[in-house]
Amino acid sequence: MPPAPATASEPPESTAPLSSSTAATESTQPPTPPAGANPVRSAVRLWLSAYRVEVMLFLIAFAVLSSFSSQRFFRQSAAPHFIYQAQSWLEGRLDVDPRVLPNLEDWACVRVVDGHKVRCEGRLLRDDRWFVSFPSFPAVVMLPFVALHGYQFNDTSFGVFVGALAVALFYSLLRFLAQEGETERNRNDNVVLSLVLAFGTLFFYCAIRGEVWFGAQVMGVALTCLYVRNAVKARRPVLAGVFYSMAVLTRTPLVFAGLFFVLEALCPGPDRLAQLKALPTAWKPAFRKLLLFGAGAAPLALLAAAYNVYRFGKPGEFGHSYFYNNRVNADIDRFGLFNLEYLSRNIQAAFLKLPQVSLSPPRLSYDPHGLTLLLTLPLLVFLLVPRTRPRLHLPLWLTVAVCALPGLFYQNTGYMQFGFRFSLDYTPYLLLLFAIGGWSLRNRAVVAVLALGVLVNFWGAVAFRGYTEFVRNW
Protein backbone atom coordinates (compact mmCIF):
# COMPACT_ATOMS: atom_id res chain seq x y z
CA MET A 1 0.00 0.00 0.00
CA PRO A 2 1.19 3.59 -0.56
CA PRO A 3 2.82 5.50 2.28
CA ALA A 4 0.82 7.11 5.05
CA PRO A 5 1.13 10.88 5.53
CA ALA A 6 4.20 11.87 7.51
CA THR A 7 2.30 14.56 9.38
CA ALA A 8 -1.30 15.59 9.64
CA SER A 9 -0.46 18.92 8.06
CA GLU A 10 1.20 17.61 4.90
CA PRO A 11 -0.94 18.90 2.03
CA PRO A 12 -2.20 16.85 -0.89
CA GLU A 13 -0.81 17.19 -4.36
CA SER A 14 -2.34 19.33 -7.06
CA THR A 15 -3.71 17.51 -10.07
CA ALA A 16 -2.41 20.01 -12.61
CA PRO A 17 1.03 19.63 -14.17
CA LEU A 18 3.50 21.99 -12.56
CA SER A 19 6.47 23.94 -13.78
CA SER A 20 9.75 23.53 -11.94
CA SER A 21 9.40 27.03 -10.49
CA THR A 22 6.28 26.01 -8.59
CA ALA A 23 7.47 22.60 -7.41
CA ALA A 24 7.60 23.59 -3.78
CA THR A 25 4.05 24.98 -3.77
CA GLU A 26 2.20 22.18 -5.51
CA SER A 27 -0.43 21.61 -2.85
CA THR A 28 -3.93 22.71 -1.95
CA GLN A 29 -6.02 22.04 1.10
CA PRO A 30 -7.93 18.71 1.08
CA PRO A 31 -11.63 18.96 0.30
CA THR A 32 -13.97 19.17 3.27
CA PRO A 33 -16.15 16.05 3.59
CA PRO A 34 -19.90 16.67 3.41
CA ALA A 35 -21.83 16.79 6.65
CA GLY A 36 -23.09 13.42 7.81
CA ALA A 37 -20.66 11.47 5.61
CA ASN A 38 -19.31 8.14 6.83
CA PRO A 39 -16.08 9.10 8.69
CA VAL A 40 -14.13 6.03 7.58
CA ARG A 41 -15.16 6.43 3.96
CA SER A 42 -14.38 10.14 4.10
CA ALA A 43 -10.96 9.49 5.60
CA VAL A 44 -10.14 6.95 2.89
CA ARG A 45 -11.35 9.35 0.20
CA LEU A 46 -9.23 12.18 1.59
CA TRP A 47 -6.20 9.91 1.82
CA LEU A 48 -6.63 8.70 -1.75
CA SER A 49 -7.06 12.29 -2.91
CA ALA A 50 -3.83 13.32 -1.19
CA TYR A 51 -1.82 10.31 -2.39
CA ARG A 52 -3.43 9.39 -5.68
CA VAL A 53 -0.13 9.61 -7.58
CA GLU A 54 1.54 7.23 -5.13
CA VAL A 55 -1.43 4.86 -5.44
CA MET A 56 -1.26 4.93 -9.24
CA LEU A 57 2.48 4.35 -9.23
CA PHE A 58 2.05 1.43 -6.86
CA LEU A 59 -0.62 -0.14 -9.08
CA ILE A 60 1.39 0.39 -12.28
CA ALA A 61 4.58 -0.97 -10.74
CA PHE A 62 2.76 -3.95 -9.24
CA ALA A 63 1.11 -4.79 -12.57
CA VAL A 64 4.34 -4.57 -14.58
CA LEU A 65 6.55 -6.32 -12.03
CA SER A 66 4.08 -9.16 -11.52
CA SER A 67 3.79 -9.59 -15.30
CA PHE A 68 7.56 -9.85 -15.69
CA SER A 69 7.73 -12.16 -12.69
CA SER A 70 5.66 -14.52 -14.86
CA GLN A 71 5.35 -18.07 -13.50
CA ARG A 72 7.61 -17.19 -10.58
CA PHE A 73 4.88 -14.92 -9.23
CA PHE A 74 2.67 -17.89 -8.34
CA ARG A 75 5.33 -19.97 -6.62
CA GLN A 76 7.68 -19.68 -3.69
CA SER A 77 11.26 -19.06 -4.79
CA ALA A 78 13.99 -21.66 -4.36
CA ALA A 79 15.69 -19.50 -1.69
CA PRO A 80 12.93 -18.74 0.85
CA HIS A 81 15.28 -18.34 3.83
CA PHE A 82 13.29 -15.58 5.54
CA ILE A 83 10.13 -17.70 5.49
CA TYR A 84 11.93 -20.51 7.29
CA GLN A 85 13.35 -18.05 9.80
CA ALA A 86 9.91 -16.59 10.52
CA GLN A 87 8.31 -20.03 10.85
CA SER A 88 11.03 -21.13 13.26
CA TRP A 89 10.33 -18.12 15.48
CA LEU A 90 6.63 -18.94 15.42
CA GLU A 91 7.50 -22.47 16.52
CA GLY A 92 9.46 -21.05 19.46
CA ARG A 93 12.99 -21.78 18.26
CA LEU A 94 15.84 -19.43 17.34
CA ASP A 95 17.55 -21.84 14.95
CA VAL A 96 15.93 -23.52 11.94
CA ASP A 97 15.00 -27.17 11.68
CA PRO A 98 17.50 -28.79 9.25
CA ARG A 99 15.00 -31.54 8.46
CA VAL A 100 12.72 -29.13 6.58
CA LEU A 101 15.28 -27.00 4.72
CA PRO A 102 14.51 -26.84 0.98
CA ASN A 103 18.23 -26.92 0.09
CA LEU A 104 21.65 -26.21 1.60
CA GLU A 105 22.41 -23.04 -0.38
CA ASP A 106 23.74 -20.21 1.83
CA TRP A 107 22.67 -21.56 5.21
CA ALA A 108 24.87 -21.19 8.28
CA CYS A 109 25.79 -24.30 10.25
CA VAL A 110 27.37 -23.92 13.70
CA ARG A 111 29.20 -26.63 15.62
CA VAL A 112 30.54 -26.27 19.15
CA VAL A 113 34.07 -27.69 19.50
CA ASP A 114 35.88 -27.37 22.84
CA GLY A 115 33.51 -24.61 23.85
CA HIS A 116 34.04 -22.59 20.66
CA LYS A 117 31.57 -22.04 17.84
CA VAL A 118 32.99 -23.09 14.47
CA ARG A 119 31.68 -23.76 10.99
CA CYS A 120 30.36 -27.27 10.36
CA GLU A 121 32.80 -29.30 8.28
CA GLY A 122 32.66 -32.85 6.99
CA ARG A 123 29.94 -35.19 8.20
CA LEU A 124 27.01 -33.43 9.82
CA LEU A 125 26.37 -34.14 13.49
CA ARG A 126 23.13 -34.29 15.44
CA ASP A 127 24.09 -31.33 17.63
CA ASP A 128 24.91 -29.01 14.71
CA ARG A 129 22.73 -25.89 14.71
CA TRP A 130 21.42 -24.28 11.53
CA PHE A 131 20.63 -20.60 11.05
CA VAL A 132 19.70 -18.09 8.35
CA SER A 133 22.94 -16.27 7.57
CA PHE A 134 21.36 -12.95 6.60
CA PRO A 135 20.10 -9.95 8.60
CA SER A 136 16.68 -10.88 9.89
CA PHE A 137 14.37 -7.89 9.51
CA PRO A 138 12.67 -9.19 6.31
CA ALA A 139 11.67 -12.26 8.34
CA VAL A 140 10.11 -9.93 10.92
CA VAL A 141 8.01 -8.27 8.20
CA MET A 142 6.92 -11.67 6.91
CA LEU A 143 5.85 -12.97 10.34
CA PRO A 144 2.08 -12.29 10.08
CA PHE A 145 1.91 -13.79 6.59
CA VAL A 146 3.94 -16.84 7.55
CA ALA A 147 1.64 -17.24 10.57
CA LEU A 148 -1.23 -17.65 8.08
CA HIS A 149 0.51 -19.70 5.38
CA GLY A 150 3.39 -21.40 7.16
CA TYR A 151 6.29 -22.70 5.09
CA GLN A 152 4.19 -22.31 1.92
CA PHE A 153 4.13 -18.49 2.00
CA ASN A 154 5.03 -17.05 -1.42
CA ASP A 155 8.09 -14.82 -1.08
CA THR A 156 8.05 -14.01 -4.81
CA SER A 157 4.68 -12.25 -4.91
CA PHE A 158 5.54 -10.66 -1.56
CA GLY A 159 8.72 -9.27 -3.13
CA VAL A 160 6.73 -7.83 -6.03
CA PHE A 161 4.42 -6.11 -3.53
CA VAL A 162 7.38 -4.65 -1.62
CA GLY A 163 8.94 -3.55 -4.90
CA ALA A 164 5.79 -1.70 -5.97
CA LEU A 165 5.59 -0.12 -2.52
CA ALA A 166 9.21 1.02 -2.82
CA VAL A 167 8.41 2.83 -6.08
CA ALA A 168 5.53 4.69 -4.41
CA LEU A 169 7.72 5.52 -1.42
CA PHE A 170 10.45 6.89 -3.68
CA TYR A 171 7.95 9.19 -5.36
CA SER A 172 6.72 10.30 -1.94
CA LEU A 173 10.32 11.11 -1.00
CA LEU A 174 10.85 13.11 -4.20
CA ARG A 175 7.62 15.02 -3.64
CA PHE A 176 8.63 15.77 -0.06
CA LEU A 177 12.02 17.10 -1.18
CA ALA A 178 10.32 19.33 -3.76
CA GLN A 179 7.94 20.70 -1.15
CA GLU A 180 10.88 21.40 1.15
CA GLY A 181 12.69 23.30 -1.60
CA GLU A 182 15.49 20.73 -1.84
CA THR A 183 14.77 20.05 -5.53
CA GLU A 184 13.14 22.01 -8.33
CA ARG A 185 11.42 18.97 -9.80
CA ASN A 186 7.71 19.10 -10.59
CA ARG A 187 5.23 16.28 -10.27
CA ASN A 188 5.82 14.90 -13.76
CA ASP A 189 9.58 14.83 -13.23
CA ASN A 190 9.13 12.97 -9.95
CA VAL A 191 6.87 10.42 -11.60
CA VAL A 192 9.45 9.81 -14.33
CA LEU A 193 12.28 9.40 -11.82
CA SER A 194 10.19 6.93 -9.81
CA LEU A 195 9.58 4.90 -12.95
CA VAL A 196 13.30 5.06 -13.70
CA LEU A 197 13.94 3.43 -10.32
CA ALA A 198 11.35 0.77 -11.09
CA PHE A 199 12.33 -0.12 -14.64
CA GLY A 200 15.58 1.65 -15.46
CA THR A 201 17.82 0.21 -12.75
CA LEU A 202 18.76 -3.20 -11.36
CA PHE A 203 15.72 -2.85 -9.11
CA PHE A 204 13.65 -4.18 -12.05
CA TYR A 205 14.98 -7.72 -12.13
CA CYS A 206 15.59 -7.89 -8.38
CA ALA A 207 11.94 -7.11 -7.60
CA ILE A 208 10.47 -9.95 -9.66
CA ARG A 209 12.37 -12.89 -8.20
CA GLY A 210 11.79 -13.35 -4.49
CA GLU A 211 14.87 -15.20 -3.16
CA VAL A 212 16.72 -14.18 -0.04
CA TRP A 213 19.42 -12.16 -1.82
CA PHE A 214 17.20 -10.06 -4.07
CA GLY A 215 14.24 -9.70 -1.72
CA ALA A 216 16.45 -8.09 0.92
CA GLN A 217 17.86 -5.62 -1.61
CA VAL A 218 14.39 -4.51 -2.70
CA MET A 219 13.18 -4.10 0.88
CA GLY A 220 16.35 -2.14 1.59
CA VAL A 221 15.33 0.38 -1.09
CA ALA A 222 11.88 0.84 0.48
CA LEU A 223 13.34 1.37 3.95
CA THR A 224 15.98 3.75 2.58
CA CYS A 225 13.20 5.98 1.23
CA LEU A 226 11.55 6.10 4.65
CA TYR A 227 14.86 6.74 6.39
CA VAL A 228 15.94 9.59 4.12
CA ARG A 229 12.55 11.28 4.31
CA ASN A 230 12.83 11.47 8.10
CA ALA A 231 16.56 12.23 8.12
CA VAL A 232 16.45 15.35 5.91
CA LYS A 233 17.44 18.31 8.13
CA ALA A 234 17.39 15.77 11.00
CA ARG A 235 13.77 16.79 11.40
CA ARG A 236 12.42 13.51 12.80
CA PRO A 237 15.41 11.88 14.49
CA VAL A 238 13.53 9.11 16.30
CA LEU A 239 11.72 7.93 13.18
CA ALA A 240 14.92 8.26 11.18
CA GLY A 241 16.64 6.02 13.72
CA VAL A 242 13.86 3.44 13.59
CA PHE A 243 13.87 3.19 9.79
CA TYR A 244 17.67 3.28 9.73
CA SER A 245 17.85 0.24 12.03
CA MET A 246 15.27 -1.57 9.89
CA ALA A 247 17.30 -0.84 6.76
CA VAL A 248 20.57 -1.99 8.35
CA LEU A 249 18.95 -5.20 9.59
CA THR A 250 17.80 -5.81 6.03
CA ARG A 251 21.01 -4.90 4.20
CA THR A 252 24.10 -4.63 6.42
CA PRO A 253 26.03 -2.18 4.15
CA LEU A 254 23.34 0.41 4.87
CA VAL A 255 24.90 0.87 8.30
CA PHE A 256 27.11 3.43 6.57
CA ALA A 257 24.06 5.40 5.43
CA GLY A 258 23.90 6.71 8.99
CA LEU A 259 26.44 9.28 7.80
CA PHE A 260 23.60 11.10 6.02
CA PHE A 261 21.77 11.75 9.28
CA VAL A 262 24.97 12.70 11.10
CA LEU A 263 25.74 15.34 8.45
CA GLU A 264 22.18 16.66 8.55
CA ALA A 265 22.34 16.93 12.34
CA LEU A 266 25.83 18.43 12.71
CA CYS A 267 26.24 20.60 9.62
CA PRO A 268 23.14 20.80 7.41
CA GLY A 269 24.61 23.68 5.43
CA PRO A 270 24.94 25.77 3.47
CA ASP A 271 28.01 26.94 5.44
CA ARG A 272 29.03 23.54 6.80
CA LEU A 273 32.55 24.52 7.81
CA ALA A 274 31.28 27.36 9.99
CA GLN A 275 28.69 25.07 11.54
CA LEU A 276 31.35 22.50 12.41
CA LYS A 277 33.58 25.18 13.94
CA ALA A 278 30.65 26.37 16.07
CA LEU A 279 29.89 22.91 17.47
CA PRO A 280 32.13 23.20 20.57
CA THR A 281 30.00 26.08 21.84
CA ALA A 282 26.63 25.19 20.29
CA TRP A 283 26.60 21.42 20.51
CA LYS A 284 23.38 20.78 22.42
CA PRO A 285 20.83 20.88 19.54
CA ALA A 286 22.92 18.57 17.36
CA PHE A 287 23.72 16.27 20.27
CA ARG A 288 20.02 16.03 21.14
CA LYS A 289 19.18 14.99 17.57
CA LEU A 290 21.92 12.37 17.55
CA LEU A 291 20.73 11.07 20.92
CA LEU A 292 17.15 10.76 19.68
CA PHE A 293 18.37 9.08 16.51
CA GLY A 294 20.28 6.55 18.61
CA ALA A 295 17.22 6.00 20.78
CA GLY A 296 15.17 5.19 17.70
CA ALA A 297 17.77 2.78 16.34
CA ALA A 298 18.74 1.13 19.63
CA PRO A 299 15.84 -1.32 20.26
CA LEU A 300 16.23 -3.29 17.04
CA ALA A 301 20.02 -2.95 17.12
CA LEU A 302 20.25 -4.40 20.62
CA LEU A 303 17.89 -7.26 19.78
CA ALA A 304 19.91 -8.08 16.66
CA ALA A 305 23.20 -7.96 18.57
CA ALA A 306 21.85 -10.30 21.26
CA TYR A 307 20.50 -12.66 18.59
CA ASN A 308 23.88 -12.72 16.85
CA VAL A 309 25.70 -13.44 20.12
CA TYR A 310 23.33 -16.35 20.77
CA ARG A 311 23.83 -17.78 17.29
CA PHE A 312 27.45 -17.01 16.47
CA GLY A 313 29.06 -15.65 19.61
CA LYS A 314 29.65 -12.12 18.23
CA PRO A 315 27.24 -9.14 18.16
CA GLY A 316 28.21 -8.14 14.61
CA GLU A 317 28.28 -11.61 13.02
CA PHE A 318 25.27 -12.44 10.84
CA GLY A 319 26.53 -15.87 9.85
CA HIS A 320 28.36 -15.67 6.53
CA SER A 321 31.52 -16.96 8.18
CA TYR A 322 29.56 -20.13 8.97
CA PHE A 323 28.29 -20.92 5.47
CA TYR A 324 27.97 -24.67 5.10
CA ASN A 325 29.83 -26.25 2.17
CA ASN A 326 29.98 -23.00 0.21
CA ARG A 327 32.24 -22.03 -2.69
CA VAL A 328 33.25 -18.79 -0.88
CA ASN A 329 34.55 -20.48 2.27
CA ALA A 330 38.12 -20.80 1.00
CA ASP A 331 38.38 -17.05 0.40
CA ILE A 332 36.72 -16.25 3.73
CA ASP A 333 39.15 -18.51 5.58
CA ARG A 334 42.13 -16.96 3.84
CA PHE A 335 41.24 -13.26 3.63
CA GLY A 336 38.09 -12.76 5.72
CA LEU A 337 34.76 -11.32 4.60
CA PHE A 338 36.30 -7.96 3.60
CA ASN A 339 39.75 -7.46 2.19
CA LEU A 340 41.71 -5.37 -0.30
CA GLU A 341 42.31 -8.64 -2.15
CA TYR A 342 38.71 -8.56 -3.40
CA LEU A 343 38.77 -4.99 -4.73
CA SER A 344 39.99 -5.77 -8.25
CA ARG A 345 37.29 -8.30 -9.10
CA ASN A 346 34.54 -6.14 -7.60
CA ILE A 347 35.70 -3.11 -9.59
CA GLN A 348 35.53 -5.27 -12.71
CA ALA A 349 32.05 -6.52 -11.83
CA ALA A 350 30.77 -3.01 -11.10
CA PHE A 351 32.38 -0.95 -13.86
CA LEU A 352 34.30 -2.95 -16.46
CA LYS A 353 32.33 -6.04 -17.47
CA LEU A 354 30.51 -5.70 -20.78
CA PRO A 355 27.87 -7.79 -22.54
CA GLN A 356 29.20 -10.79 -24.41
CA VAL A 357 28.44 -10.74 -28.13
CA SER A 358 28.71 -13.80 -30.36
CA LEU A 359 28.22 -13.70 -34.13
CA SER A 360 28.25 -17.43 -34.78
CA PRO A 361 25.58 -18.11 -33.75
CA PRO A 362 24.22 -14.59 -33.10
CA ARG A 363 23.90 -14.24 -29.36
CA LEU A 364 23.95 -11.54 -26.69
CA SER A 365 24.75 -12.68 -23.15
CA TYR A 366 25.95 -11.30 -19.83
CA ASP A 367 28.53 -12.31 -17.26
CA PRO A 368 26.78 -13.55 -14.07
CA HIS A 369 29.55 -11.92 -12.03
CA GLY A 370 28.49 -8.43 -13.10
CA LEU A 371 27.85 -5.83 -15.78
CA THR A 372 29.09 -2.25 -15.89
CA LEU A 373 26.97 0.35 -14.12
CA LEU A 374 27.45 2.58 -17.15
CA LEU A 375 24.91 0.32 -18.87
CA THR A 376 22.65 -0.71 -15.99
CA LEU A 377 22.52 2.84 -14.55
CA PRO A 378 23.74 5.11 -17.37
CA LEU A 379 22.43 8.23 -15.58
CA LEU A 380 25.72 8.06 -13.71
CA VAL A 381 27.38 10.12 -16.44
CA PHE A 382 25.21 13.14 -15.61
CA LEU A 383 26.04 12.91 -11.91
CA LEU A 384 29.68 13.62 -12.75
CA VAL A 385 28.77 16.92 -14.43
CA PRO A 386 25.83 18.36 -12.45
CA ARG A 387 24.41 21.70 -13.51
CA THR A 388 23.59 22.65 -9.91
CA ARG A 389 25.11 21.69 -6.56
CA PRO A 390 22.44 22.44 -3.96
CA ARG A 391 22.58 21.80 -0.23
CA LEU A 392 22.15 18.01 -0.40
CA HIS A 393 24.82 17.49 -3.07
CA LEU A 394 27.67 16.80 -0.63
CA PRO A 395 25.83 14.61 1.94
CA LEU A 396 24.32 12.47 -0.81
CA TRP A 397 27.69 11.92 -2.52
CA LEU A 398 29.39 11.09 0.78
CA THR A 399 26.61 8.62 1.60
CA VAL A 400 27.03 6.95 -1.79
CA ALA A 401 30.78 6.69 -1.24
CA VAL A 402 30.61 5.06 2.18
CA CYS A 403 27.75 2.72 1.21
CA ALA A 404 29.69 1.58 -1.88
CA LEU A 405 32.80 0.60 0.08
CA PRO A 406 31.50 -2.68 1.60
CA GLY A 407 30.49 -4.07 -1.79
CA LEU A 408 33.84 -3.19 -3.33
CA PHE A 409 35.87 -4.95 -0.61
CA TYR A 410 33.48 -7.90 -0.10
CA GLN A 411 34.45 -11.50 -0.74
CA ASN A 412 31.66 -11.99 -3.28
CA THR A 413 30.77 -9.99 -6.39
CA GLY A 414 27.08 -10.86 -5.94
CA TYR A 415 27.23 -13.87 -8.26
CA MET A 416 24.80 -15.03 -9.72
CA GLN A 417 23.37 -11.74 -10.88
CA PHE A 418 22.60 -9.40 -13.76
CA GLY A 419 24.71 -6.32 -13.17
CA PHE A 420 26.43 -5.41 -9.91
CA ARG A 421 23.45 -5.85 -7.61
CA PHE A 422 25.21 -4.49 -4.52
CA SER A 423 24.89 -1.06 -6.15
CA LEU A 424 21.17 -1.20 -5.40
CA ASP A 425 22.03 -0.31 -1.79
CA TYR A 426 22.94 3.20 -2.91
CA THR A 427 20.91 3.54 -6.11
CA PRO A 428 18.23 5.67 -4.37
CA TYR A 429 20.93 8.15 -3.35
CA LEU A 430 22.29 8.23 -6.91
CA LEU A 431 18.83 8.99 -8.28
CA LEU A 432 18.40 11.72 -5.68
CA LEU A 433 21.68 13.21 -6.89
CA PHE A 434 20.26 13.31 -10.40
CA ALA A 435 17.03 14.85 -9.07
CA ILE A 436 18.93 17.75 -7.50
CA GLY A 437 21.55 18.00 -10.25
CA GLY A 438 19.66 20.34 -12.55
CA TRP A 439 19.53 18.22 -15.71
CA SER A 440 16.22 18.51 -17.54
CA LEU A 441 14.36 15.30 -18.31
CA ARG A 442 13.55 16.86 -21.68
CA ASN A 443 17.20 17.08 -22.67
CA ARG A 444 17.78 14.76 -25.64
CA ALA A 445 20.91 13.23 -24.15
CA VAL A 446 19.08 12.56 -20.88
CA VAL A 447 16.16 10.97 -22.73
CA ALA A 448 18.56 8.75 -24.71
CA VAL A 449 20.34 7.63 -21.55
CA LEU A 450 17.04 6.93 -19.78
CA ALA A 451 15.91 4.83 -22.74
CA LEU A 452 19.19 2.91 -22.68
CA GLY A 453 18.80 2.17 -18.97
CA VAL A 454 15.26 0.89 -19.43
CA LEU A 455 16.30 -1.23 -22.42
CA VAL A 456 19.25 -2.82 -20.59
CA ASN A 457 17.24 -3.55 -17.46
CA PHE A 458 14.36 -4.91 -19.54
CA TRP A 459 16.93 -7.34 -20.92
CA GLY A 460 17.97 -8.23 -17.39
CA ALA A 461 14.39 -8.81 -16.25
CA VAL A 462 13.76 -11.11 -19.20
CA ALA A 463 17.10 -12.88 -19.55
CA PHE A 464 18.44 -13.39 -16.03
CA ARG A 465 18.43 -16.99 -14.86
CA GLY A 466 19.27 -17.34 -11.21
CA TYR A 467 19.14 -19.96 -8.50
CA THR A 468 15.40 -20.62 -8.82
CA GLU A 469 15.68 -21.31 -12.55
CA PHE A 470 18.82 -23.38 -12.00
CA VAL A 471 17.13 -25.58 -9.39
CA ARG A 472 13.85 -25.97 -11.27
CA ASN A 473 15.36 -26.00 -14.78
CA TRP A 474 12.94 -23.37 -16.11
Where are these predicted regions, by residue range?
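Membrane-proximal envelope and lipid/glycan-remodeling enzymes
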Residues: 1-6, 10-474
